[in-house]
């Protein structure tokens, strides 16, 4: 009703993504907090690629719920979102999940929760180091 929406297209398929409602934002932030607490309590626990994909699928599912047929077929929003999340995980490629997740963050004005808060570089600072998903290692 009041939420912003945007069409999202991937491989010729278009869906409507919605801004997260206030309740959904709270649920998403609670998930992020639980993940951070788990990482702190277990020093060996790292935020994995699987965690990133599942978190993205959950966020996308919450966004899709607003215009999804499951919205009226399930007794609760949480049950419907879980089912939509499974649909996203089983039918969407990871690239689409990631791109859709970014759209939802933008629609919801939530980039401040996921953007690195590192100080901005000045022009004199020189080029930034390249970002790599691989492990750092020394070559001998």
Swiss-Prot record:
Which UniProt keywords are listed? Host cytoplasm, Late protein, Viral release from host cell, Viral tail assembly
Q: Identify the GO cellular component terms for this protein.
A: host cell cytoplasm
Q: What Pfam families would the database entry show?
A: Phage_TAC_2
Q: Which domain of life is it from?
A: Viruses
Tell where it localizes.
Answer: Host cytoplasm
User: One biological-process term from Gene Ontology?
Assistant: viral translational frameshifting
Q: Where is this region: Disordered?
A: 121-140
- Where does it mainly reside? host cell
**What InterPro entries is this protein classified in?**
Tail_assembly_G, Tail_assembly_GT
Question: Subunit info?
Answer: Interacts with the tail assembly protein GT and the tape measure protein.
Quote the function comment for this protein. Answer: Promotes tail assembly by creating a scaffold for the tail tube proteins. Tail assembly proteins G and GT probably wrap the linear tape measure protein to create a tail assembly scaffold. This allows the polymerization of the tail tube protein, during which G and GT are released, therefore they are absent in the mature virion. The tail assembly protein GT is produced by a rare -1 ribosomal frameshift. The ratio of translated G/GT is about 20, and this ratio is important for proper tail assembly.
Would you identify the family this protein belongs to, as annotated?
A: Belongs to the lambda-like tail assembly protein family.
Q: Which NCBIfam families match?
A: phage_lambda_G
Annotated protein name in UniProt: Tail assembly protein G
The protein's organism comes out as Escherichia phage lambda
Report the gene name: G
């Amino acid at each position: 009703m009041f939420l912003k929406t945007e069409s999202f297209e991937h491989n010729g398929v278009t869906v409507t993504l919605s801004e997260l409602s206030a309740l959904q934002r709270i649920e998403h932030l609670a998930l992020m907090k639980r993940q951070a607490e788990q990482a702190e309590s277990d020093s060996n626990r790292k935020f994995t690629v699987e965690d990133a994909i599942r978190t993205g699928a959950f966020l996308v599912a919450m966004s899709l719920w607003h215009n999804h047929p499951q919205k009226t077929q399930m007794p609760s929003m949480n049950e419907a979102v879980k089912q939509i999340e499974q649909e996203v995980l089983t039918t969407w490629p990871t690239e689409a999940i990631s791109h859709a997740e970014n759209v939802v963050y933008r629609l919801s004005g939530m980039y401040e929760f996921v953007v690195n808060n590192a100080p901005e570089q000045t022009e004199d600072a020189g080029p930034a180091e390249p970002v790599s998903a691989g492990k750092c290692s020394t070559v001998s």
